[in-house]
Structure formats: C-alpha cells, structure tokens
Amino acid sequence: MRHFLLFCLFVLVQVSAFAIPPRPDAFTLRQADGSEITVYRCGDERFGYYTTIDGLILQRGADNGLYYAEVKDGKLIATKQLAHNPQDRKAPELKLIKKLSNTAQQVDQLLSLPEHRTKMIGNNGDGLGQWGVSGFGAVSSVGKHTIPVILVSYADVELGDTITTEKISRQLNEKGYHDEPFTHGSARDYFLAMSQGLFDPTFEVVAKVKVSHGYAYYGKNSNGRNDVRVLDLVKEACNLAAEQGVDFNKYVEADKGCVPLVSIMYAGPGEANSTDSNSDDYIWPHQWTGIDYMYSGYTIGNQGVKVGAYFVGNELNEYTSGGVKKKRLAGINIFVHEFGHALGLPDGYYTGSDPSVRNRLKTMGLWDHMDIGCYLNNAATPVAFTSYERSYLGWLKLEELKEERTYALQPFDIEGRDNTAYIIRNPKN
C-alpha cells in the first residue's frame, strides 16, 4: 500500500530558509583552458556564487568553467570570458573586468531582497527570550521532542557501507559519542549541554532509502539560485520511508498539528563545504520552514500527515591529510547548525561579496556556531551558541548591567543552570 503525506511545505505565504555558511578558506579549481584559479565560495543555499581572491564575482559556464558574472534581469549569469588569477589576466579580460565593476554591488542588492533577509522575532519586546519559554522555530526549544531522520542515497551516489541507521543513531544520540577524530559527544549531548537540560531531543533514524534520480537532478543550480529541485528530494524520501512502514503520525505534535521537522542526510558531500569540480550540483545543506502558511491539500500518500519543516545535510566532509584531499563521515556540526535554524536561530554570517562590508560587520566568526564556528576541527567539534542565542531559545537568563561595579564571568560549564551572562544596552540603538 502506498502511504500518503501531506506537505505544508510548498504553498507558503511566508517562508524562512537558512543554511550552513560556505567554507571560509580559498581553494583552487582547474579551468577549462587548463589554468588554475583560486576562489572563495560565497552566498548561501538560495543564492550561491564564487569570487576571485580580489573579489570579482564568478559563475559557472556551460563547460563547468568559472566565468566572470554579470546581473541581468535579476539573475546572475556567466559572461563569455573565462576567469583567471590576477597575475594571469590579459588586456581583453582586464577591459571586461572594468565594465563589470558594479557586479558585486548588484549581487549585494539581490541578496538584500526580502526573500534573502532574515527576521528574528523574540518572545518579548526587546528581541530577547525568556528563560524556560521556547523560541519561535519550527521545533519548540523547550521540552522533549522526537525528530525523524531519513538517510538518502541517490540513484548514482550511494551512502557509504558503514552508514547504517544504527551508526547515525549513535552519532546523533549516544552519550559521549567519539568514534571520529575531534568528536566529543553526540548531537543530543550538545543540545542538552547548551540548554542545561531544558531541551531534550531524540533523533530517531527511521529509514534508509534510495531516490529515483542522481544528485545533480536535485542539486541543480540556475542563474545563482541553488538546489531548484530539493523539495522533490524531500517529498520522495518521505514517501519512500512511509512505504517502508514508517508511521509519521507518531511524530505529529498536537500543538503544531503536524510533524514539526523531518531531517534528511543525503549521500556524499555538500555544496557549501566541497571543493570538487562538480560541487555546484551538490545540495547546499539548509533548513526550510513554512511560517503562517496556507496548506494546499497536495497529497502524496494516505497517512494524512503534514510536515512543517525540513533540513538536509551531507554525509561526507572534506579534509586534507599530507596535502591530499580526503573525505570522511561529516561530524555533527552541520546537523547542529541546521537544527539551530529549526529551533529559530538565524545565520550569523555575511552572505554578500563586499570585503569592506564583511570586515565592518565583524560577526562572531569562529566564536559562534551559527557563523563559521560550525567549521571548527573540520566540522567535527561544535562551538557553543552565543549567550544571545541561548537567551532567545529560553535557555539562559541575561543580567542587564545598569551600574558601575565589578562583575565576574565564569566558564560556561561551571555554573549549570545559574550560568551568568550580561547585557549592556545601547540607548541610541
């Protein structure tokens, strides 16, 4: 019997989408003419692109080479000029670069459109949270919750032989899990520690399935827009899990009227953190939530279950050993980052292309897991959420400093639920 799932993912009045940041380091790719170019990956899961080391915007051409890009009709498209490192550019290339001098500004304008902006609503008037009160994510950040996880192979890329439901269940739930280098606990361990026990998740690995198309079908990008068929992957994976006997009704939460979140681990690397020449066709790890949505009645089964949000993350992560690029099971950092979005946290990193803006913003960087802290130790050791993020999620009380005296800050793991953090308000902002 075919099982049915109703998705409240697809006809939305308002949605929020968040993603892991692109890897922060430059890397080298071989061009169609045999030359090598050093680039940065930029953007996010909605709008991705590359830049040269001197900040010029690049886009993939039909031959998979990197070309200087221009914005036309709100789309980022490749010109006919193959890109090179600064020292290798010839006169015609330099002439075109001068002509494209506004491209970076145009890309930043595209990224400032409403669909790329993030709004974060606190549960009180000042944008902060209240201790013991959930944030406004797809998943409530207080209490016990069970989240279904599906492992997905593509038609042309299989999950590794060691990637079993038991293995991933251990990685996500086992106390003190440490199988891979730099691992110091499971995803559940992390959330119990960050919330000091206020949030107690169980990540139930419910199925291992194989979808009907190859990775490039679902991960296809179009004019800078990423992963245009990723929802097909989510629907198909859930249908296949239901056909295997997974009853999604058991994950419905009464106060939400749906399954709050389905998590998917897909085979191979992810677009955000891979340097493979075909990595544009990988899916960029991200989380998607429907907010104030209208349900369309679209059915793909007979369980009558709605799914409120999903996130997708990659199986493998890159690392370099002895100058050789290798891949191994991704650590929990990607999972933790995307699940942070499901709890209501936005990205903390700058997605634009202007180095001066990036330097001026001075985000938390490696000190925040919702920024590039998710790349610590090859994405195996998650950095703590910031005090603001824990306050927003209802896990930490902030004490406002109003008078001059001596204050002390203790390490996070010393004080337990009495952990102290301070807030200083700027009356002019």
Where are these regions (language model features)?
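Zymogen propeptides/activation segments of proteases
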Residues: F18-T299, R417-N429
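Bacterial Sec-dependent N-terminal signal peptides
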Residues: M1-P21
